[in-house]
């Protein structure tokens, strides 16, 4: 008979099952994104997942690690999925391949693999692509109700691999809405228009007519919110990070909007547009690169929320989730150091 030593804990959940649950929780948001922006989103996800699995398998083989066993943890699958849904649906195929390979090989495996990476791999891949190819990374189609030329599955496939539809239209022509005006994401559109128009006039534009967060985008964010609530219910993630993230972002947006409503976006636009809910529930909560203490998670999430608001308002990019997460990842060792819970019976030491 063997006697086990303490601590006596029991957890039936494996890394594989948690990763799979997170992947399943992404489905509502992916469905909404596919409905409003076409099949390109699904194609990007498929390309990213295939690249992630192949890149991870190749590195594991070179490191003489058990390839099939390690691939079964589903972490590469999740990294590819998160990066795939973050890219514009009709971005060239080589971009998603390059970004995913960089995320897996450099941002994850170079540090030792799962559990060793200090930065979120998917966001590292995204930022590398955004800095290297800013035009392609901001070339989103208009949402379905505003599309001048709806794009089917075959045209999406052709555009991703050749740059043109079967009728010869390129991405710039597909970006033109039904009103003949080239469309952008709500955050990008708001940021650009604010240079010459007041907020009230901007919110009268077609992309905002179905809601303050922009046509389609509020439904995508609601989809990821639903998936995030599922993760909280199943206790796959801690509540501290998403709650503090959203409260900090909403607080900054609300204060600025109340002080200068003609110059700042309303809180609803910040909360339900861009990658807000995806970032709050699926990216910032990465257990490897996030803070590990309860107070640390609150600080970590709030820091991301504040940084997202600062980048969106004062930065050069319309959405700042990826940069905010990576900047907060840098602060994790410091946050964890100063938020370690005090051991019962011991006083906090001073050095």
UniProtKB/Swiss-Prot annotation:
Annotated localization: Cell inner membrane
Transmembrane segments: 18-38, 42-62, 87-107, 121-141, 212-232, 241-261, 264-284, 298-318, 320-340
PTM annotation (FMN phosphoryl threonine): residues: 185
GO cellular component: plasma membrane
Enzyme class label: translocase
One Gene Ontology term from the biological process aspect of the record: electron transport chain
Catalytic activity, EC: 7.-.-.-
Quaternary state and interactors: The complex is composed of six subunits: RnfA, RnfB, RnfC, RnfD, RnfE and RnfG.
Name listed for the protein in its UniProt record: Ion-translocating oxidoreductase complex subunit D
Organism per entry: Yersinia enterocolitica serotype O:8 / biotype 1B (strain NCTC 13174 / 8081)
Organism phylogeny: Bacteria, Pseudomonadati, Pseudomonadota, Gammaproteobacteria, Enterobacterales
């Amino acid at each position: 008979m063997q006697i086990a030593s303490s601590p006596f804990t029991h957890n039936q959940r494996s890394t594989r099952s948690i990763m799979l649950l997170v992947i399943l929780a992404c489905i509502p948001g992916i469905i909404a994104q596919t409905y409003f922006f076409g099949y390109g989103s699904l194609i990007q996800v498929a390309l990213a997942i295939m690249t992630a699995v192949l890149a991870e398998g190749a590195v594991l083989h070179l490191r003489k690690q058990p390839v099939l066993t390690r691939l079964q943890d589903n972490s590469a699958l999740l990294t590819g999925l998160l990066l795939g849904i973050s890219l514009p649906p009709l971005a060239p195929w080589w971009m998603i391949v390059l970004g995913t390979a960089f995320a897996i090989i450099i941002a994850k495996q170079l540090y030792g693999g799962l559990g060793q990476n200090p930065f979120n791999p998917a966001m590292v891949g995204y930022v590398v692509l955004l800095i290297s190819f800013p035009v392609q990374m901001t070339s989103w189609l208009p949402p379905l109700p505003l599309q001048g030329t709806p794009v089917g599955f075959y045209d999406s496939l052709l555009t991703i691999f050749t740059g043109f539809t079967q009728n010869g239209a390129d991405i710039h022509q597909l970006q033109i809405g039904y009103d003949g005006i080239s469309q952008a994401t709500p955050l990008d559109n708001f940021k650009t228009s604010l240079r010459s128009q007041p907020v009230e006039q901007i919110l009268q534009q077609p992309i905002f007519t179905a809601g303050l967060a922009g046509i389609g985008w509020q439904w995508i964010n609601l989809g990821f919110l639903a998936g995030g609530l599922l993760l909280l219910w199943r206790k796959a993630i801690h509540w501290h990070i998403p709650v503090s993230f959203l409260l900090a972002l909403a607080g900054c947006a609300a204060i600025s909007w109340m002080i200068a409503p003609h110059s700042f976006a309303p809180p609803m636009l910040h909360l339900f547009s861009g990658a807000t809910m995806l970032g709050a529930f699926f990216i910032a909560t990465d257990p490897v690169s996030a803070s590990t203490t309860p107070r640390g998670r609150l600080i970590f999430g709030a820091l991301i929320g504040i940084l997202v608001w600062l980048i969106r308002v004062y930065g050069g990019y319309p959405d700042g989730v990826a940069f905010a997460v990576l900047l907060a990842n840098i602060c994790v060792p410091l946050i964890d150091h100063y938020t370690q819970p005090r051991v019962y019976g011991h006083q906090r030491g001073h050095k």
